[in-house]
């Protein structure tokens, strides 16, 4: 059995607890993700997909349950440890790329590496390597506004993988793209996962894309159901 990259047990999250507007979005979520595995997370808007990804990626905390990333138990972990694990072991991709508009494609990939203590030279080499993997080596000097939507999202993938994470969390990464571009970007994502051997949990409304992943998990009434 391959290494466990992400393990979640008994995750619970309620918003506005104790008020008339109380909403329990996660009601005991369990999930195990192995190295190299790509898993789809499917649910309607407002069902808790983003909340689950944020807790899994240490951007939010659950009311109950535990999260383990690459063998590191995050239960009760201090902010400093959570930040270190998030920077080193987790990569994020969102529906909207959130690239910094004043920086080039390459610079957008270099910056998170510098924040993680990587030298400028090594960060630029890693950025160039990733851009070449997604076919954008000739677009390295272009700012986001000069790139197409699909190109911007490919740069966002590269940025997410810049620090060589073990886990990629993607929230509707193709949701803002037309069908043809969405398919192309998804293929690039699968190529990157294959090249790096990381694990990926990908939230999507696109059932056709979901069916091409290793497993499909549906978030229903706050729990995960595999189909």
Curated annotation (Swiss-Prot):
Q: What is a GO molecular function of this protein?
A: transmembrane transporter activity
**Matching InterPro entries:** AAA+_ATPase, ABC_transporter-like_ATP-bd, ABC_transporter-like_CS, ABC_transpr_LolD-like, MacB-like_ATP-bd, P-loop_NTPase
Instruction: Write the Enzyme Commission number(s) for this entry.
Output: 7.6.2.-
Q: Which GO terms describe its cellular component?
A: plasma membrane
Picking any one GO biological process from the record gives: protein localization to outer membrane
Q: How is the protein disposed in the membrane?
A: Peripheral membrane protein
Where's the ABC transporter domain?
6-227
Q: Which PANTHER family match?
A: IMPORT ATP-BINDING PROTEIN, LIPOPROTEIN-RELEASING SYSTEM ATP-BINDING PROTEIN LOLD
Question: What is the stated purpose of this protein?
Answer: Part of the ABC transporter complex LolCDE involved in the translocation of mature outer membrane-directed lipoproteins, from the inner membrane to the periplasmic chaperone, LolA. Responsible for the formation of the LolA-lipoprotein complex in an ATP-dependent manner.
Q: State how it assembles.
A: The complex is composed of two ATP-binding proteins (LolD) and two transmembrane proteins (LolC and LolE).
Annotated family: Belongs to the ABC transporter superfamily. Lipoprotein translocase (TC 3.A.1.125) family.
This chain belongs to the protein called Lipoprotein-releasing system ATP-binding protein LolD
Organism, by scientific name, is Ruegeria sp. (strain TM1040) (Silicibacter sp.)
């Amino acid at each position: 059995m391959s290494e466990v990259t992400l393990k979640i047990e008994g995750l619970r999250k309620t918003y506005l607890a104790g008020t008339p507007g109380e909403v329990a979005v996660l009601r005991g979520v369990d999930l195990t993700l192995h190295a190299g595995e790509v898993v789809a997370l499917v649910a309607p808007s407002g069902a808790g997909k983003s909340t689950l990804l944020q807790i899994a990626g240490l951007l939010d905390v659950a009311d109950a349950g535990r999260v383990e990333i690459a063998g590191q138990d995050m239960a009760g972990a201090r902010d400093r440890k959570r930040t270190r694990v998030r920077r080193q072991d987790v990569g994020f991709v969102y529906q909207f790329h959130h690239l910094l508009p004043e920086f080039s494609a390459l610079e957008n990939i270099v910056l998170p590496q510098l924040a993680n203590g990587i030298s400028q030279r090594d960060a630029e080499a890693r950025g160039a390597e990733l851009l070449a993997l997604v076919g954008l080596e000739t677009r390295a000097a272009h700012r986001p506004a000069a790139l197409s939507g699909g190109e911007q999202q490919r740069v966002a993938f590269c940025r997410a993988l810049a620090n060589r994470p073990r886990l990629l969390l993607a929230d509707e990464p193709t949701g803002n793209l037309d069908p043809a571009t969405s398919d192309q970007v998804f293929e690039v994502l699968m190529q990157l996962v294959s090249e790096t051997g990381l694990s990926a949990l990908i939230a999507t409304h696109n059932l056709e894309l979901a069916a091409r992943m290793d497993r499909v998990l549906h978030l229903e009434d706050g729990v995960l159901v595999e189909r």
